[in-house]
Regions:
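Hydrophobic faces of well-ordered beta-strands that scaffold small-molecule active sites
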Residues: 23-29, 55-57, 80-84, 149-152, ...
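Aromatic-lined substrate-binding rim segments of carbohydrate-active enzymes
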Residues: 43-47, 53-101, 211-235
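Hydrophobic h-region of N-terminal signal peptides that target proteins for export
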Residues: 9-18
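Catalytic domains of carbohydrate-active enzymes, especially glycoside hydrolases
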Residues: 33-63, 143-148, 257-265, 332-340
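Substrate-binding cleft of secreted/luminal carbohydrate-active enzymes
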Residues: 267-278, 295-369
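Active-site-adjacent "subsite" loops/lids of carbohydrate-active enzymes
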Residues: 70, 79-143, 316-319, 324-329
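Boundary/entry segment of secreted carbohydrate-active catalytic domains
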Residues: 19-43, 240-244, 304
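Polysaccharide-binding and catalytic clefts of secreted carbohydrate-active enzymes
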Residues: 114-262, 270-278
Length: 369
């Protein structure tokens, strides 16, 4: 009898040790106004079955949208975070044109946005901007079904584009150019002069003034940390999509995100944008994890929607990880300390992607030292 019990115990021990732990997986998703509750339920059930644990949902500014969709997501057993852009805001009766950022040529992001029409960035130095955002995120955080607020575009416009995007815009960004350098509005210029004694408009090459860079890092950091207080007062989490680094993030979009008081970070480790392979994903993840200590880092992975056309596709925004690369990208992320991954997006995943993904998420990854 004792021998039989010993065999049973050993069997369960061996079975338990053989079981592979599933890694946490979140995903960025856009809102579909046309879908019924039934259709959304089926979609979310399918994503849960495929291994998604949390949804970062972009549904606009209306709390009722998140109440409706959040209830469905929560009923499928997934986390529900609201993905709401921060500094990028289109025309809105609640926002005045003078609250938008101004570049080194004196052009407003409202009238003449950089790169693409939707790059209408607000200025983080304006108290009115903070009030608008605090009201927006505070109202959404009050929705019972919401687990957390997910910030995006919490930055300045790209003063330096990722290398893989240069050809798309016909640019060589080997230095900072004034038309992409923000913000030179009267408030920012006056506040910087008050704190440093320097009138930045009188400087021939502002990119050489480190205090001016730090001033703008701090503007974003202070705004984030104030918004954190708002969201935490509602007993909700707050996290953000950020550029890789934070070394690259600082140089490119003025994000010094290792100083942000968030509950988690979601760096967009989109290797194709940087003309890099999956090894780079691991290297940058290691930097990110080390920069924030014990704070969770979810490695954002950019998926190629049409793998068979990637080589012939000119637009890098249609590039991304191929099915045969996704396992390596996940492995590099997890072995270098990521708490999990975040997919951009489930809708870009092919059947071949899902097959490789399923194999990769049920593994015990050993952290690199």
């Amino acid at each position: 009898m004792h021998k039989f019990l010993t065999i049973i115990v050993l069997f369960f021990i061996l079975s338990s040790s053989a079981q592979k732990t599933k890694i946490p997986v979140h995903a960025w998703m856009g809102h579909s106004k046309e879908k019924t509750d039934k259709e959304l339920k089926e979609q979310f059930k399918d994503l849960k079955k495929k291994g998604i644990d949390g949804i970062m949902y972009n549904g606009g500014h209306d709390p009722e949208t998140y109440r409706r969709v959040g209830k469905i997501v929560k009923n499928t057993g997934m986390e529900f975070h609201t993905w709401v852009p921060t500094m990028v805001q289109g025309k809105n009766p609640k926002l005045k044109e003078e609250w938008y950022a101004v570049n080194g040529l004196g052009e407003s992001a409202f009238d003449k946005p950089a790169y693409v029409d939707h790059y209408k960035f607000l200025c983080p130095s304006r108290e009115e901007v903070y009030n608008f955002l605090a009201d927006l995120y505070g109202s959404i955080a009050e929705v019972e079904e919401v687990d957390g607020i997910h910030l995006d575009y919490i930055r300045f416009p790209d003063v330096i584009l990722a290398r893989g995007l240069w050809d798309k815009y016909g640019l060589v960004m080997d230095r900072e150019f004034p038309q992409f350098d923000y913000c030179y509005c009267d408030v920012c210029v006056a506040d910087f002069e008050a704190s440093s004694g320097v009138n930045i408009k009188e400087i021939k090459d502002p990119s050489q003034v480190e205090e001016w860079k730090q001033f703008r890092y701090d503007l974003i950091t202070d705004l984030v940390n104030r918004l954190t207080e708002v969201v935490h007062s509602k007993d909700k989490q707050i996290n953000a999509a950020v550029f890789p680094g934070p070394s690259d993030a600082k140089k490119m979009v003025r994000q010094e995100w290792n100083k942000w008081n968030l509950d988690a970070l979601y760096p967009m480790n989109y290797n194709d944008f940087y003309l890099e392979g999956t090894k780079w994903v691991g290297d940058i993840t290691k930097e990110e994890v080390m920069s924030v200590g014990d704070k969770p880092v979810f490695s954002g992975l950019f998926i190629c929607p049409n793998p068979e056309k990637k080589i012939s596709e000119a637009d890098p925004e249609n590039h991304g990880l191929l099915p045969e690369e996704i396992e390596a990208a996940i492995q590099e992320s997890m072995e270098n300390g990521a708490a999990g991954i975040c997919l951009f997006t489930p809708g870009r995943m092919t059947e071949a992607h899902w097959k490789a993904f399923n194999k990769a998420i049920y593994k015990n990854y050993k952290k690199n030292k």
